[in-house]
Amino acid sequence: MKTKINEFIKMKGKNFSTNNTGKRKKTDFYETPYSLTELLLEKENIIGEILEPSCGKGAIVKVLQKLGYSMSFYDKEKNFLKETKKYHTIITNPPFSLAFEFIKKAKEISDIFFFLLPLSYLHGKKRFDEVWTDKKFPLARIYVFTRYPLLGEKLREDGKHNTGMMVYAWYVWEKNYKGEPVIRWLDNNKYIIKRREGYNHCLWDIKQKMNNLDL
């Protein structure tokens, strides 16, 4: 028991939802399981010209394009914080270290934007003073996932994912929205990989790789 407690103390503050090293590797992408975007689109009618400014390998873009949305997207090759073009809608899983700056920029160039962030992002005095009390471009809705989604894994086409230890939510900011923010839930339970299912999928993946080996 003492050993387990010591292990927990060592891991305290690390991002459980990405990997168990606590460090973000240069090759880490923190990709968004397809189902997280699909569930949002079941609740929100996204319109107008769309931008995804932190697309990584294109997980969010793939879902939107599959549904017929036309959009612009980029990643590190362009600095979103210097963007001047106006877009009606922005949807992204922003780099957490730049989330505050991304929010400020999105308010300058869009009418509505959707950011995937940890639920704990609601906490903080600076955010309260500069983000949550903004009446001209307020937070309108928060969509909280009922199960903790694990980000950063290799994505599955069926949208299923493992569970992590970080609560995530879609935050929706809407220009000129009136009223208090509304909290809603997105039930992602059907997309959670069950233990046996994950084991079988792992075996299938190994077999596929072995079949592709040139022996």
Residue map of PLM features:
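Class I S-adenosyl-L-methionine-dependent methyltransferase catalytic core
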Residues: 1-215
